[in-house]
Amino acid sequence: MQTMIKTALTVLAILLPALVSAHDFEVNGIYYNINGNEATVTYQGSYAGQYNEYSGAIVIPETVTNDGITYAVTSIGEHAFENCSDMTSLELPSSVTAIGSWAFYGCSGLKSFEIPNSVTTINDYTFCRCSGLTDVVVPNSVKTIGMSAFYTCSGMTNLSIGTGVISIDRYAFKGCSSLTNLTIPSNVHEIKECAFEQCNSLTNVTMGSGVTIVGKDAFLDCTNLTKVTAIDLTPWCRINFATQKANPLYYAHHLYLGAAEVTNLTIPASITSIGDYTFTGCSGLTSVSFPNSVTGIGSYAFSECTGLTSVTIPSAVATIGRSAFYGCTGLASLSLGNGVTTIGSYAFQKCSSLTTLNIPNSVTAIQEGAFSRCEGLSSVNLGNSVVTLGNYAFEVCTGLKCVVIPNSVKTIGSCAFYGCDTMTDVIIGNSVTAIGYSAFAYCHSLKGVVIPDAVITIDNSAFSGCNSMTSAKIGNSVTTIGSSAFERCTSLSDLTIGQSVASIRNSAFRNCEALTSVVIPNSVTEIDNCAFIECSALTDVTIGNSVTNIGYSTFAECSALTSVAIPNSVTSIGMDAFKNCSGMTSITLSNSLTTIEESTFEGCSALESIVIPGSVTTVGYHAFANCYGLASITLPTSITSLAYYAFESCYHISSVTLTGEGEWRGGTISILRAVSVSIPNGITSVKGMYLKPSVVYCYAMTPPACDANSFTDYSGTLHVPAAALAAYQAAPYWQNFMNIVGDAVEATPGDVNGDNKVSISDVSALINYLLSGDDTGLKIANADLNSDSKVSIADVSSLINLLLSSDTE
């Protein structure tokens, strides 16, 4: 054991110097590491910053001697003086050729320092956070300036970059907030990302002729720049700027050649393409002349050149890039050459002084937002070759009066003409197949539109808010009218829906308050939610015989609607579908309907009667609530669920007629006042109805099963078949009626042929009677279904409706 301890102590003794010190020797308070015949200045401790080794004025010798050996001092090691905040000055010998990364990081007290002309590289973070440095001279020997080399040297007021520098790395001078002037020498080829970001005292930049690449946001937040000087226009036009804020012009706004500001720009003949961001923000430009050599104009090339008044694009140019002339608010005249094929996204957005536009026939695509928010634009000629009008192409061109979309156009993009307030007329070419989302929304002055037959889809909100539109004709190829397509077209009074429309989507015609009549063609299968809600002038609706679904609130608040016939194709009507149609007096329901949803007819206060067809099984909460004018209701035995408040506040119901056969399974019929009750032959049970009858007409030969909840009062008169009088007088609960009358004629409304049931044969018998006048064997009194004391063709219609509303065969 003692041997092992001794061995461990011996190893520790050998390693201990290495653990406590990273230097090889020290001379005159300077610490060194040996590398062959050379010495590198380093720090004292086992890690950088362990001790504040250096303070005051430091002088590094050319040579240093240790143990009789002389070494040439050739480099400053990594982290050598890191965070030595008390060091005020430093002299380096000409023998030093390399300065390591982080060498002077955080030396905030360092005010005077000269980089020897022997140094070839300034590495990453070398002088980072040396906030006391005021004057920096990068010697001609230096080739590269590393990443964050002078990051946040906030006291630096003067910077001289040597002519040997070819690359300035990212963040190299970021946050040098006192720097006012900058000259990039001509040997520099690349300025990397954010190299001069937040140099917010910088006013002047001179760009050398050798620069070809400027990285992303190289001059970001250099907000006090006023002047950029180029040595020559040709190399300037060839610089590849990564972003707008890579170009110092974005903030400076003024470009100089020598002492003269460039206002009338002539692009050199040697230039074939204007690069991205080349003149972005140069508001001092008033004109630009392109040579025929130029074939393309890059993205943001002249964006926000607010002084430009006139631009002529030569025929050699094929493509105008994204936002190329964005925000050129002074541009009043634009001539596009006949070689241009594509106008890029937002190319002329916010050119608010532009008044007229002629698109040459060479142009096939006007991309997204190309002329959006050109508020002064009043006249547009789109040429005859444009195939695509991109999204937002002419959005908020508030001065635009009239647009003719040529036959070449296939698609009109989303919001293409959104918010063109003064546009009164649009002619849509006969090749357009799709009208995009909000394409013409809020064109408040648009008077009308004719959708040609080639159009298949009208997308959501396409014409929403066009409140001066009085007419809309939808072509015969349109299959879908999108959600809110014509919402708030408050003047729309003349509407034609094409014969191929299959779906009318949510709120398609919502709040079209001038619309009086709608014909929904037989092609339509679905009328979606709120499609015609708040069409307050709508009096007449014809629903085609292919509609299967009417969505919720579809015709709600259509207060002028007087009657509706729901075709038998309809299987579903959503909640609130006809809510508050306060002028509706009659409605005919589909015999395919199974459910009347919650509040479907709530507030139809003029409705006089309702016949619920025999297909219905469920009547929902408030289905007919507040139908104050409702006097007569017909309920089939198919109903298995009748909501307690289905007829809430229907104070004037005086007649309840059951139809069908078998048991009443609907439960309580919640009507508070006394009513006349009619029960046909074939009903076998009326348990749980909970009705207060003023009079009951029960035509069943066998008294239907009854319970204590069938009737709440027995003071009214019970009319029964004379032949069944004794049976009712003896039947439980029926016998409780104070006055039971046996009618000599067994009156079953609709039983024309006297077989004690109502069927299609009764319709045939009634028609024959009306044609021949022969009533032999008929009970004609049973045919007066509308109680007008005469039998006419109107009773045939009533009899058919009775059959459709019941399970009777």
Task: Briefly describe each language-model feature range.
Residues 1-24:
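Sec-dependent, cleavable N-terminal signal peptides
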Residues 13, 17, 743-809:
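Cellulosome-associated attachment modules in secreted, modular CAZymes
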Residues 21-49:
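GGW-centered surface loops in extracellular recognition modules
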Residues 23-34, 267, 658, 662, ...:
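Disulfide-bonded cysteine-rich modules in secreted/extracellular proteins
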Residues 35-37, 53-75, 85-98, 108-121, ...:
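Structural signature of tandem-repeat unit edges
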Residues 77-80, 100-105, 123-128, 146-151, ...:
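Consensus positions within tandem repeat domains that build extended binding/scaffold surfaces
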Residues 707-711:
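Small/polar residue-rich beta-strand/coil "junction" motifs that cap repeat-based extracellular fibers
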Residues 730-747:
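A recurrent domain-boundary module in secreted/ectodomain proteins
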